[in-house]
C-alpha cells in the first residue's frame, strides 16, 4: 500500500511539473501577429540585404570558377576579389 501511495505521488508530481512547463511554454510563445512581425524583421527580408547576399554569392562563385581554371593557388592572394600575384609572389607552392 505504501508503494502504491509513493507511485501515485510520483505520478502526480511529474504531471504537475509537465503542466507547469506547458503553461510556461504557452506564456512565452509569441502570438501569430508577433510571429509575422519577427519574420519581417529578419535580416534577409529587406531588398538591400538580399542584393548584398546575392552579390557575395556571385563573387564567391566567380572566385571558385577562376580557381578551377587556373594553376595559381588563389588562397595565397591578399585580395581574393582581384586576379594577379598573391602573397606567394605569383607562384604556387
UniProtKB/Swiss-Prot annotation:
Membrane-spanning segments: 8-28
InterPro entries per record: UQCC3
Residue numbers spanned by region Mediates lipid-binding: 23-80
Mitochondrial matrix side: 1-7
Chief location of this protein within or outside the cell: mitochondrion
Highest taxon listed in the record's lineage: Eukaryota
Keyword annotations from UniProtKB, A to Z: ATP synthesis, Disease variant, Membrane, Mitochondrion, Mitochondrion inner membrane, Primary mitochondrial disease, Transmembrane, Transmembrane helix
GO molecular function: cardiolipin binding; phosphatidic acid binding
Topology with respect to the bilayer: Single-pass membrane protein
Example of a GO cellular component annotation carried by this entry: nucleoplasm
Mitochondrial intermembrane topological domain: 29-93
Subcellular location: Mitochondrion inner membrane
Record disease entry: Mitochondrial complex III deficiency, nuclear type 9: A form of mitochondrial complex III deficiency, a disorder of the mitochondrial respiratory chain resulting in a highly variable phenotype depending on which tissues are affected. MC3DN9 clinical features include feeding difficulties, hypoglycemia, severe lactic acidosis, and delayed psychomotor development.
Described purpose of this protein according to its UniProt entry: Required for the assembly of the ubiquinol-cytochrome c reductase complex (mitochondrial respiratory chain complex III or cytochrome b-c1 complex), mediating cytochrome b recruitment and probably stabilization within the complex. Thereby, plays an important role in ATP production by mitochondria. Cardiolipin-binding protein, it may also control the cardiolipin composition of mitochondria membranes and their morphology.
Subunit structure: Associates with the ubiquinol-cytochrome c reductase complex (mitochondrial respiratory chain complex III or cytochrome b-c1 complex). Interacts with UQCC1. Forms a complex, named COMC, composed of UQCC1, UQCC2; UQCC3 and UQCC4; mediates MT-CYB hemylation and association with the first nuclear-encoded complex III subunit UQCRQ.
Family: Belongs to the UQCC3 family.
Protein name listed in UniProt: Ubiquinol-cytochrome-c reductase complex assembly factor 3
Native organism taxonomy: Eukaryota, Metazoa, Chordata, Craniata, Vertebrata
Annotated gene: UQCC3
Amino acid at each position: 500500500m505504501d508503494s502504491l501511495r509513493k507511485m501515485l505521488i510520483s505520478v502526480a508530481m511529474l504531471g504537475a511539473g509537465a503542466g507547469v512547463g506547458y503553461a510556461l511554454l504557452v506564456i512565452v510563445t509569441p502570438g501569430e501577429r508577433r510571429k509575422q512581425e519577427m519574420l519581417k524583421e529578419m535580416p534577409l527580408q529587406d531588398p538591400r540585404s538580399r542584393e548584398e547576399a546575392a552579390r557575395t554569392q556571385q563573387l564567391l562563385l566567380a572566385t571558385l570558377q577562376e580557381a578551377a581554371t587556373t594553376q595559381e593557388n588563389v588562397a595565397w592572394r591578399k585580395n581574393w576579389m582581384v586576379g594577379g600575384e598573391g602573397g606567394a609572389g605569383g607562384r604556387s607552392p
